[in-house]
């Protein structure tokens, strides 16, 4: 799905971390870094967002919504509808979406600017409520992610992340959680090591780089 299959060919090889050691994750060495730069739809996302850490709650919520909605569809389709998602989901305001009622659900399911799938719409509302709850338990979504980045002293792998997400969130299978975390720097593999975007991201010291294996 998405970055994994849109012009991408994941080989399952391992990424060399900044320290020169091999990560133990089978990560994506894809051609996304070949075709996305300069592409009118993929280019800006590839160059400035994919793999770039952020702590902004609305941005994290947006990324989760987009990754969930991409399931079964192309990433290009989702990027083209991004403005529609922003309008439909109150600018990705967690508090607003968390209070959506049945009338809001019906509005979303009738909106051609987004993906009109009941399970995905319900997941967005539930996940907004889950994120809001994380403010009380951990201080916020970003703090929750940071608190669970390590497992037994090493970088938490995708399988462990999926188990954790499923305790609080809906529609969070392996591919969705993996891409969500990779896109935010919690897992390695968003870019090839020779990609200029990778070189820029390294300077930001994403979580996966802070805890090389």
Stretch-by-stretch model annotation:
Residues 9-10, 25:
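Intrinsic-disorder-associated, low-complexity terminal segments enriched in Asp/Asn/His/Tyr and depleted
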Residues 19-20, 185:
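Generic low-complexity, intrinsically disordered sequence content enriched
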Residues 3-9, 17:
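Intrinsically disordered, low-complexity polyampholyte segments enriched for Lys and acidic residues
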Residues 25-213:
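HhH-family (HhH-GPD) DNA N-glycosylase catalytic core used in base-excision repair
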Residues 4, 21-24:
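Basic polycationic patches enriched in arginine
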